[in-house]
Amino acid sequence: MTTPSTAPTPAPRKAEVSRNTAETQITVKLNLDGTGKASLSTGIGFFDHMLDQIARHGLIDLDIQAKGDLHIDGHHTVEDVGITFGQAVAQAVGDKKGLRRYGHAYVPLDEALSRVVIDFSGRPGLEMHVPFKSGMIGTFDSQLAYEFFQGFANHAFVTLHIDNLRGDNAHHQAETVFKAFARALRMALEIDPRSAGVIPSTKGSL
């Protein structure tokens, strides 16, 4: 009598990355196969709220602790969180075998609608078109959303397209962008059982 074989348990896709400069001290811990739990402290309330959307809608367990030169402004903190988050995602993804690779999502919030498309291509690039209706959202400079996603794309080695298709409220615009990013990321990071152990590229590498 033969014993049925069982599939090997996949290795947990977790990472911890720290970044320490004269401007910021940041630690990111994540589990790509989590349930959306978050512990976030950047000193910028609205930014924490947006990072929470990534965790919740991306089903990523996310712990980000950041201290930065907020007496100047939020630029270094937001950009460096994006960089460190990108590095952590790249580390957790590993060789990309079995990865769906591509992800996309549309997310509405009242009058606002955003679309995000992501490709774990190994070729960093960001195309972002979000005409924010206000320069500030609470204490968050809306221009810094670009810096966050630029830092992420460059260090996660992804191609990222972000478009706000409509919106009259800057808070709604930002929230749809971050939620759509989370949903697209969640899709791209899924492991496809039909291509387990296979890198999703005809080149054989990414």
UniProtKB/Swiss-Prot annotation:
Pathway: Amino-acid biosynthesis; L-histidine biosynthesis; L-histidine from 5-phospho-alpha-D-ribose 1-diphosphate: step 6/9. GO terms for cellular component: cytoplasm. It is an enzyme of class 4 (lyase). GO terms for biological process: L-histidine biosynthetic process. GO terms for molecular function: imidazoleglycerol-phosphate dehydratase activity. Belongs to the imidazoleglycerol-phosphate dehydratase family. This is Imidazoleglycerol-phosphate dehydratase. It comes from Polaromonas sp. (strain JS666 / ATCC BAA-500).
